[in-house]
Amino acid sequence: MPAVTRTTAVAVFAVVAASCSSGTPAAPAAAAAPVMKPLVSVKEMMRFDIDPASDYVFDAVQYDATTKGVSDIYPKTDEDWEKVKIGAVSLAENIYLLKLKRPWTPKGDVNNSTGPNPPELSPEQIQAKYDKDPVLWDAKIEALRNAALEIMDVADKRDVKGLFEASADLDMACENCHLEYWYPGDRAAVEEDKRQRARIDPSAKRSAKKK
């Protein structure tokens, strides 16, 4: 039988010792969280996402004023309530996407901010307002989300009266944000519109009182 050299014996011992080790293998490194990159501006987000979602709510509850009087429009079927829920869930989930840093408008779009007494703010003016008080921007977003959560709740309960009130809360949250960051110069026109609507729309009257 051939002799086993000292070097060979040491090598074999090392292999056996390694294979018998009771140590646990190192856990694989956790995958890095994906970086969320906004695709569109705030203005486009509103046009293609937030506004269409809110329309599911606003279109579901209305007061139709005619020469014959005022009639209520409200959800009557499961399908009607399903549409309200779709809008509310979309709003509640997607509104937080406005917290991601993104352009205020598409490239080259300056809103209606030129000429004498422009009704809308430019992207630079909006950014200046945000930089001055970023907490306020987050508060406006939270108000919108809370209104959406309220609508989700009344949709589950099939609460018609609650839906009229919740839609008024959503409308107020939207206008409060727009008057702060989009068209503060139109505040008088908006308030006049609210007064006119309140003449026939009890939910609008309730909204005006809460301001």
Regions from the language model: what does each represent?
Residues 16-19:
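C-terminal motif of bacterial Sec signal peptides marking the signal peptidase cleavage site
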Residues 25-85, 89-211:
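Sequence context surrounding c-type heme c attachment/ligation sites in exported
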Residues 1-10:
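Bacterial N-terminal signal peptides that target proteins for export
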Residues 6, 21-23, 35:
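Secretory/periplasmic and organellar redox-cofactor proteins
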